[in-house]
């Protein structure tokens, strides 16, 4: 009799913990969706990537570290910037729903042939990671990135996705957003950037702390020229106006 009672008690305890876990999971999922809805209308004061950079600086005792971040509405950013970002990072941005499966397939194909596994993250995925998550590679983060990307694409128009991307992308150590980068590295505002300036900013995005916008090396000069050519082939800023 005692064994039956003990067994029933164990089953009851497991049920309680499963129910609690389910409730926590549902609340967390709901909160994440609410986050996405809020930032559809509210400009983010910070991103998780910025918070992570602060913590990294403090852990390294970089007490004088400063974050450079100035929000700038898309209407106040030169038209050359959005098309340069799309040309550099995600040329199918107007057409996909957050995931570019063609790019993923090509990346996996290159890797299977012995090549380096390059990222195939869309702009939407990068926004999800930079705004809500942490840096680094893990299946957990990738899974959460996919979750946030789905809701971002559902609730935000493409214009809003591109606006937030242009404002929270890192262009240098502690320098986030087109406005801050333009002022710090090019001595002008985001509204005054020409095609060459925009391409130069976009060229460093794969590794912004490694490359220098003010003193670009051969690779950045080459990539900047490539981005300008790609932007023109896409049709310039009209490529984004049509979609």
Swiss-Prot record:
EC number: 2.4.99.28
UniProt topology in membrane: Single-pass membrane protein
GO CC, one annotated term: peptidoglycan-based cell wall
GO biological process, one term: peptidoglycan biosynthetic process
A family per Pfam: Transgly
InterPro entries associated with the record: Glyco_trans_51, Lysozyme-like_dom_sf, PBP_transglycosylase, Pep_trsgly
TM helices/strands, residue ranges: 21-43
Pathway(s) served: Cell wall biogenesis; peptidoglycan biosynthesis
SUPFAM superfamilies given in the database record: Lysozyme-like (SSF53955)
Keywords (A to Z) from UniProt: Cell inner membrane, Cell membrane, Cell shape, Cell wall biogenesis/degradation, Glycosyltransferase, Membrane, Peptidoglycan synthesis, Transferase, Transmembrane, Transmembrane helix
Catalytic reaction(s) noted: [GlcNAc-(1->4)-Mur2Ac(oyl-L-Ala-gamma-D-Glu-L-Lys-D-Ala-D-Ala)](n)-di-trans,octa-cis-undecaprenyl diphosphate + beta-D-GlcNAc-(1->4)-Mur2Ac(oyl-L-Ala-gamma-D-Glu-L-Lys-D-Ala-D-Ala)-di-trans,octa-cis-undecaprenyl diphosphate = [GlcNAc-(1->4)-Mur2Ac(oyl-L-Ala-gamma-D-Glu-L-Lys-D-Ala-D-Ala)](n+1)-di-trans,octa-cis-undecaprenyl diphosphate + di-trans,octa-cis-undecaprenyl diphosphate + H(+)
Family per similarity comment: Belongs to the glycosyltransferase 51 family.
Role this protein plays: Peptidoglycan polymerase that catalyzes glycan chain elongation from lipid-linked precursors.
HAMAP family cross-referenced by the UniProt entry: PGT_MtgA (MF_00766)
NCBIfam families, per database record: mono_pep_trsgly (TIGR02070)
Protein name according to UniProt: Biosynthetic peptidoglycan transglycosylase
């Amino acid at each position: 009799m005692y064994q039956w009672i003990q067994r029933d008690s164990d089953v009851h305890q497991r049920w309680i913990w499963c129910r609690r876990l389910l409730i926590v999971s549902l609340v967390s999922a709901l909160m994440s969706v609410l986050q996405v809805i809020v930032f559809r209308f509210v400009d983010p004061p910070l991103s998780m990537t910025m918070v992570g950079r602060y913590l990294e600086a403090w852990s390294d005792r970089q007490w004088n570290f400063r974050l450079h971040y100035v929000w700038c509405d898309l209407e106040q950013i030169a038209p050359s910037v959005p098309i340069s970002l799309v040309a550099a990072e995600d040329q199918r941005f107007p057409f996909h729903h957050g995931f570019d499966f063609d790019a993923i397939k090509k990346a996996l194909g290159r890797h299977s042939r012995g090549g380096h596994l390059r990222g195939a993250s869309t702009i939407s995925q990068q926004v999800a990671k930079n705004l809500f998550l942490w840096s680094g590679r893990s299946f957990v983060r990738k899974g959460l990135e996919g979750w946030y990307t789905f809701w971002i694409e559902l609730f935000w128009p493409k214009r809003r996705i591109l606006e937030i991307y242009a404002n929270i992308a890192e262009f240098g150590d502690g320098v986030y957003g087109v406005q801050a980068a333009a002022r710090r590295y090019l001595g002008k505002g985001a509204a005054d950037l020409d095609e060459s300036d925009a391409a130069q900013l976009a060229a460093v995005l794969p590794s912004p702390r490694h490359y220098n916008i003010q003193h670009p090396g051969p690779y950045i000069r080459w990539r900047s020229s490539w981005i300008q050519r790609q932007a023109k082939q896409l049709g310039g800023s009209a490529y984004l106006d049509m979609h």
